[in-house]
Every structure is written in structure tokens, then in C-alpha cells.
Amino acid sequence: MKQYLHLMKKVLNEGTEKEDRTGTGTVSIFGHQMRFNLKEGFPLVTTKKCHLRSIIHELLWFLKGDTNIAYLRENQVSIWEEWADKTGSLGPIYGKQWRAWGTPDGHQVDQLSQTLELLKNNPDSRRMIVSAWNVGELDKMALAPCHAFFQFYVVKKTLSCQLYQRSCDVFLGLPFNIASYSLLMHMIAQQCDFFLGDFVWTGGDIHLYSNHLDQAHLQLTREPRSLPHLLINRKPDSLFDYHFEDFSLEKYNPYPAIKAPVAI
């Protein structure tokens, strides 16, 4: 994960101080790309301990098309608590857009299912895209999508994916995002009988919050360790039938966690 630490150092060294929606303040750069070869290991940050259970449950929750945090609460995942209303609803965020994008005539589009069909039946397509950035529903969302748009690419039975992330919290959010989309790639590769290729991450406004700077400097003192390996213990009938127990991680040997406040 040296790419991640390089980006963190770049933000610290080259970033500009900016105000932001949360009122916290950031140091920010605009535009950067990283590439992770998933054949070399699962890209979960080792320079601090990451909560893989939350990453897995959040992705399974997205895949269900769910936008209420009840499922997350049942599984002791609290990462969306601050944005939910009294009923637990977050509005039409990621899961709704991935699985049930509303059309002007009142129908719904399951973008993920359509993309899976293309991956299986027309893998040379340039339309294997899923978007969460639904302009017509942004004002109904508790939080506008940060990881907004992703595209798949297949060559010689090898699956790659590129994500565009319009807003990136480097210290807290980015390790989750990299691991989450890499996990999704593992699942789709299994479902489609593909080899694993590259996860390509492209960022827009890439920032460290002003109350994360000390934590970032601490993390940069730590030498990255070998990447762990993700195992999927069974092959479900579809992408939407995975359970938490289907995943295990081997040889994850991180440094201790580094606590930091979440900007709301």
C-alpha cells in the first residue's frame, strides 16, 4: 500500500488549505490516480488496523439495495449512524442507485444486474458502468455519493475496475473505499469466472481534514507490511447471495489502529 502513503504525503506536502461543507477545514489537492494489482494481494492498509467487518457488511448492504441502517446496526456497524434520520433512513443513497435507479417514466433500473449481464455475455462492452450520482435525487440523500461512478474492463478473461471518487477523505475513508471495491471485484470475478486484474482508483477533491494531520504524520512513520490475502469460502448462486461468513482474510498483520474524528 505504498501508493496510499505516497498520496497521503503528497496531500501534506502539496495540498492547499480549503474550507469544506463540514466546517472542519482541509488540506486538499485535485486529481490523482492509483493502481492496485489484486493478484499481488488484497489492498487493505497495513500501517493501521482497518475494520474489515464493517467494510464487508457495508458492501453487502449496498448490494441489497438497502438504504436504512437497521441491517448495519444488527451487525454492530456504526459508520453511517451520524447521517441517518430518526427512522434509520439515509434517503436514496448508493444501494438505491445501484439496484433501483428511477427513470422519468416511473420504472427502475438495476444497474448492477445489467452490468453483470454484460460482463458475462458481452465483456468487450464499454458500457459496463454503475453510477450513484443521480442528480435528480441528490437533495434527498443524507450524503451525496463520494465514490460516484465505476466501470469494468475485461481483457483475456481478466477483470479490472476503475472508480471515480469525487470527494476523498484520505485518512478515514479511502482505506475503506479501496478495500470495498477490491472486495466487489473478487466477488464479481468469482461469479463470472474471471481472473483478477487491477483496481484503478481516480480521485477528484482529495483531502486530509485539519484534525487528521497528526494522525497522518504518525501513519507515515510506519513501514508498510505484506498485503493479506482474501478468501471466498463458497460460490453463491448470484452476486446478491453472499453472506459475511463467506469471506476470510489471511496473513493480515497491521500496526495498531489510529483513532480520528469523523467530519459530519
UniProtKB/Swiss-Prot annotation:
Residues engaged in binding dUMP: 21, 126-127, 166-169, 177, 207-209
Residues reported to bind (6R)-5,10-methylene-5,6,7,8-tetrahydrofolate: 51, 169, 263
Determine the domain of life of the protein's source: Bacteria
Cysteines paired by S-S bonds = none
Compartmental location: Cytoplasm
Q: Which UniProt keywords apply?
A: Cytoplasm, Methyltransferase, Nucleotide biosynthesis, Transferase
Q: Does the keyword Transferase apply?
A: yes
Record-linked InterPro entries: Thymidate_synth/dCMP_Mease, Thymidate_synth/dCMP_Mease_dom, Thymidate_synth/dCMP_Mease_sf, Thymidylate_synthase, Thymidylate_synthase_AS
Gene3D superfamilies documented for this protein: Thymidylate synthase/dCMP hydroxymethylase domain
Q: Name one GO molecular function term.
A: thymidylate synthase activity
> Which sites are catalytic?
146
Q: In which pathway does it act?
A: Pyrimidine metabolism; dTTP biosynthesis
Annotated GO biological process: dTMP biosynthetic process; dTTP biosynthetic process; methylation
Reactions catalysed, semicolon-separated, are: dUMP + (6R)-5,10-methylene-5,6,7,8-tetrahydrofolate = 7,8-dihydrofolate + dTMP
Chief site of localization = cytoplasm
- Which Pfam family, just one, is annotated for this protein? Thymidylat_synt
Gene Ontology CC: one annotated term: cytosol
Q: What is its EC number?
A: 2.1.1.45
The record's comment on protein family reads: Belongs to the thymidylate synthase family. Bacterial-type ThyA subfamily.
Function description: Catalyzes the reductive methylation of 2'-deoxyuridine-5'-monophosphate (dUMP) to 2'-deoxythymidine-5'-monophosphate (dTMP) while utilizing 5,10-methylenetetrahydrofolate (mTHF) as the methyl donor and reductant in the reaction, yielding dihydrofolate (DHF) as a by-product. This enzymatic reaction provides an intracellular de novo source of dTMP, an essential precursor for DNA biosynthesis.
* Entry-linked HAMAP family: Thymidy_synth_bact
Query: Subunit info?
Result: Homodimer.
Its name, as the record gives it, is Thymidylate synthase
Q: Which organism is it from?
A: Hamiltonella defensa subsp. Acyrthosiphon pisum (strain 5AT)
The taxonomic lineage of its organism, from the top, reads: Bacteria, Pseudomonadati, Pseudomonadota, Gammaproteobacteria, Enterobacterales
